[in-house]
Amino acid sequence: MSKSRLTVFSFVRRFLLRLMVVLAIFWGGGIALFSVAPVPFSAVMVERQVSAWLHGNFRYVAHSDWVSMDQISPWMGLAVIAAEDQKFPEHWGFDVASIEQALAHNERNENRIRGASTISQQTAKNLFLWDGRSWVRKGLEAGLTLGIETVWSKKRILAVYLNIAEFGDGVFGVEAAAQRYFHKPASKLTRSEAALLAAVLPNPLRFKVSAPSGYVRSRQAWILRQMYQLGGEPFMQQHQLD
C-alpha cells in the first residue's frame, strides 16, 4: 500500500473513531438527561420538520406536548403494550422469541417484512436515530436500547415512548393526539379511544385515526381483546406502569 493511501486510511480511521466518541458522549448524555427531564423533540420530529421545509411546506409543524404518566390514561399505556410489545414489563429491551419468528417469516415472505421491535427499541430509534433500514442503524439501536433499559425504569421508557410516538401527520405524543382527534386531554382517553390510537402505530402516515379504515377498526378490536386478556387496568398497577 502506498504512503498516500496509508495517510488517507489513517485519517479516515481517526475521524471515524472521533465521531464514534462524540456520538457516544452525545447519546449517553441524552440518555442520562432524559431519564428525568421532559423530551422537547425527537430525531423523528426533526427529520419530519426538515423534510417538510425542504419540500417547501412551511406550514408543517411537528407538534408535541409533554405529559407525565400521571396525566395519561392507563388505558393508553395498556393499549400500546397490547398492540406493540406484550412482554414489555419482563424483557430487557429485546424480545428474542419475536425476533426469531420475524426472521423466519421474512425468509418465507420477502415482500412482506415483519418487524419485531420492542417498545424500548422503538423509543431508542425514534428519540435518537434517523429513519431507514441498515445494519449500522440496527447496531446503534441495540446499543441505545441497552442504554435506556439500564438507566431508565420501564415506566420512564413507556412515558417517553407515548410522548414522542407519531400518531399522524405532524402529531407527536399522546397529548397532542388526544387533543387533535378527541378534543380532550390524554388523561381522559377511554379504552376504545386508546385502542384506536394504538391501532395506527404501525404506519401513522398511512392509517388515519380521523378516518379509520376497515383494517384499522379490525386492529382496534383485536387490541381491545388483547387488553382484556392482559388483565385490564390492574396489569398496569401490577407492573408499576401507571
From Swiss-Prot:
BP GO annotations: cell wall organization; peptidoglycan biosynthetic process; regulation of cell shape
InterPro entries: Glyco_trans_51, Lysozyme-like_dom_sf, PBP_transglycosylase, Pep_trsgly
Lipid bilayer topology: Single-pass membrane protein
Gene3D superfamilies: Biosynthetic peptidoglycan transglycosylase-like (1.10.3810.10)
GO molecular function: pentosyltransferase activity; peptidoglycan glycosyltransferase activity
Reactions performed catalytically: [GlcNAc-(1->4)-Mur2Ac(oyl-L-Ala-gamma-D-Glu-L-Lys-D-Ala-D-Ala)](n)-di-trans,octa-cis-undecaprenyl diphosphate + beta-D-GlcNAc-(1->4)-Mur2Ac(oyl-L-Ala-gamma-D-Glu-L-Lys-D-Ala-D-Ala)-di-trans,octa-cis-undecaprenyl diphosphate = [GlcNAc-(1->4)-Mur2Ac(oyl-L-Ala-gamma-D-Glu-L-Lys-D-Ala-D-Ala)](n+1)-di-trans,octa-cis-undecaprenyl diphosphate + di-trans,octa-cis-undecaprenyl diphosphate + H(+)
Compartments reported by the entry: Cell inner membrane
Disulfide bond entries: none
The protein's Enzyme Commission number: 2.4.99.28
Main location per the UniProt record: membrane
Residue ranges crossing the lipid bilayer per the database entry: 19-39
Any GO CC annotation of this UniProt entry: peptidoglycan-based cell wall
Pathway annotation from the record: Cell wall biogenesis; peptidoglycan biosynthesis
Family label: Belongs to the glycosyltransferase 51 family.
Function comment: Peptidoglycan polymerase that catalyzes glycan chain elongation from lipid-linked precursors.
Full protein name: Biosynthetic peptidoglycan transglycosylase
